Design a protein with these regions (language model features):
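Hydrophobic alpha-helical
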Residues: 1-55
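Structured segments of extracytoplasmic/periplasmic soluble domains
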Residues: 8-12, 34-38, 57, 61, ...
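Short, hydrophobic secondary-structure boundary micro-motifs
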Residues: 18-19, 66-67, 93-95
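Glycine-rich, flexible loop/turn motifs
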Residues: 54, 63, 98
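Short, charged, surface-exposed secondary-structure boundary motifs
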Residues: 54-57, 76-78
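Short beta-strand elements at the ligand-binding edges of bilobed clamshell
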Residues: 60-72
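Hinge/cleft segment of the Venus flytrap/periplasmic-binding protein
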Residues: 70-110
Length: 110
């Protein structure tokens, strides 16, 4: 689906299209496939999840970056909220879990 959507964006927006922020690495990789077919190597593409394929795409310079989603951090954040609630407390409405940007200089690519 990301290939088709990106092809449509290339047709509709032409060179005004300068960035694609995808919901996950697989969508970002589909967008990259369409961008390559359209000879558009100038578009900033960001994925999410830091999958092996996503990290490889960053390493190869195909994707600008991906975002590492820390499952342990997310689970720990959820556990803190639940524990606070069980103990009768009022947890914050929003719990921020830090993320890590994985770009060409990231230690996660080493």
């Amino acid at each position: 689906q990301a290939v088709t959507v990106t092809e449509n964006w290339i047709t509709t927006y032409g060179h005004k299209l300068n960035a694609i922020l995808a919901n996950n690495d697989e969508m970002a990789l589909g967008a990259i496939k369409a961008l390559e077919a359209g000879n558009r190597k100038d578009v900033f593409v960001l994925g999410v999840d830091a999958t092996l394929d996503g990290r490889n795409a960053v390493r190869e310079g195909l994707m600008a970056a991906t975002v590492f989603q820390d499952a342990n951090g997310q689970g720990g954040g959820a556990a803190k909220v639940i524990t606070t609630k069980i103990k009768g407390g009022n947890p914050e409405k929003i719990t921020w879990v830090p993320f890590q940007l994985v770009d060409k200089d990231s230690p996660l690519l080493k």
